[in-house]
Amino acid sequence: MEAETECKVPGVYSETGIPVEDPAPGLNSDVSKKDAPPAVAAPGPGLYFEIGKKARDLLYKDFHTDQKFTLTTYTNNGVVITAASTMKDEAIFSEIQTKLKSNNVMLDVKATSDSQVLTTITTEDLGVSGLKQIVSLPFPYQTAGKAELQYLHDYAGISLGVGLTSKPLVNLSGVFGNKSVAVGADVAVDTSTGDFTKYDAGLTINNSDLAADLTLNNKGDSLTASYYHLVNKESGTAAGAELTHSFSTKENTLSFGMQHALDPLTTVKARYNNHGMVSALIQHEWRPKSFLTLSAEVDTKAIDKASKVGLSLVLKP
């Protein structure tokens, strides 16, 4: 997991609300790069940023080259408190996060070591089943607040995000189809200039053990195809690949990887790309919801350089 050097604001580009997928045995499903709270599985195609998520999680999730410690505690009245500290390049970044849920409202307050505070209020089933509201209010950057509406339907997933400024950035994404086949688009407009800052499109095909995705990104400048295959559900054995082509630079990037559960509590993953980067990790659930992850990265084209090693310890008593 990479250390975040600034207070990330969910909202316009939020991944809050992504349905949690069943992980392979031993694979950490509770700790994600976005720290998104768990949500009920979407009845239909989900939201746009879920296109290609299975392959991305296999290829990139839990690989890290820093050292991170996370401790989560639970109070009797339902408050969840998480303290995390990350060391990278001799710099230490820390944060403390408090979550409290009452009925359908979740209050999330996060304070970081660089004196930033982010308050996020999430309201589920806002008058209509499947409708969610997310409001993010950072401090001291009050003008960077964001509000988002997400709607999940059997045949659609729609998200509308608006920055809380006089001339905000507006982001609209939609996915239409079902759990097997869906198409979607993601568009962002800067209302201060009238310019499109993003326009992406995607296609996804899924079944219980296969996922194939095709996305057009970076305003049409890059095309990404990804593939995920759950080879054996009992052992958690899976394989995946991702190919990205840049039309402007004519450059191709190919990554492929595999994962396998050595036992119900231990998972190994490996990844390789055509630039010669090799990564591997082993993750062990040494007690319920507590994980120790050791990962390493080596540049095979510069083998004389020192390899990078990452360590993550997550404790949930």
Swiss-Prot record:
Main location: mitochondrion
Record InterPro entries: Porin_dom_sf, Porin_Euk, Porin_Euk/Tom40
Top-level taxon of the source organism: Eukaryota
Transmembrane spans: none
Matches recorded under Pfam families: Porin_3 (PF01459)
Cited Gene3D superfamilies: Porin
One GO MF term: porin activity
Keywords, comma-separated and alphabetical: Ion transport, Membrane, Mitochondrion, Mitochondrion outer membrane, Porin, Transmembrane, Transmembrane beta strand, Transport
Cellular component GO terms held in the UniProt record: mitochondrial outer membrane; pore complex
Compartment(s) of residence: Mitochondrion outer membrane
Signal peptide range in chain numbering: none
CDD domains recorded: Porin3_VDAC
Region ranges (Disordered): 1-30
Role, per record: Forms a channel through the mitochondrial outer membrane that allows diffusion of small hydrophilic molecules. The channel adopts an open conformation at low or zero membrane potential and a closed conformation at potentials above 30-40 mV. The open state has a weak anion selectivity whereas the closed state is cation-selective.
Domains (record comment): Consists mainly of membrane-spanning sided beta-sheets.
Annotated family: Belongs to the eukaryotic mitochondrial porin (TC 1.B.8.1) family.
Annotated protein name in UniProt: Mitochondrial outer membrane protein porin 4
Source species of the chain: Oryza sativa subsp. japonica
Gene assigned in the entry: VDAC4
